[in-house]
């Protein structure tokens, strides 16, 4: 069965505004989703903007972030099994990232 990456984009300050009780409830939702049978792998990423590496004129350049003008960052990922893109999108519709204002990019893993 094909594998798909769910790339989770969100504004990290959104979850930080939750009360401790709301944060616990959110964490439980994320963990429940991670434990679904379709999920093969998944992790949260740190809130820092990371680094972007580019080759320019034969030299490797490293910059902070991917985009300094946006608040949304790549905050995590999941690898899931699904029959098709449509199936992967349907399965991702109840992911808590969407509930908390984030977006999900769905991409098929090459060779699966």
Cite the ranges covered by each PLM segment.
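Conserved, structured core segments of small domains
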Residues: 1-112
């Amino acid at each position: 069965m094909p594998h798909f990456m769910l790339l989770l984009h969100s504004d990290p300050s959104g979850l930080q505004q939750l009360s401790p009780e709301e944060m616990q409830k959110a964490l439980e939702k994320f963990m429940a989703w991670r434990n679904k049978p379709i999920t093969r792998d998944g992790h949260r990423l740190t809130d820092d903007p990371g680094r972007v590496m580019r080759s320019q004129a034969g030299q490797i350049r490293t910059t902070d972030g991917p985009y300094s003008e946006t608040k949304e960052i790549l905050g995590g990922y999941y690898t899931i099994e699904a029959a098709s893109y449509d199936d992967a999108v349907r399965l991702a519709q109840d992911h808590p990232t969407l509930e908390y204002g984030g977006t999900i990019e769905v991409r098929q893993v090459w060779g699966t």
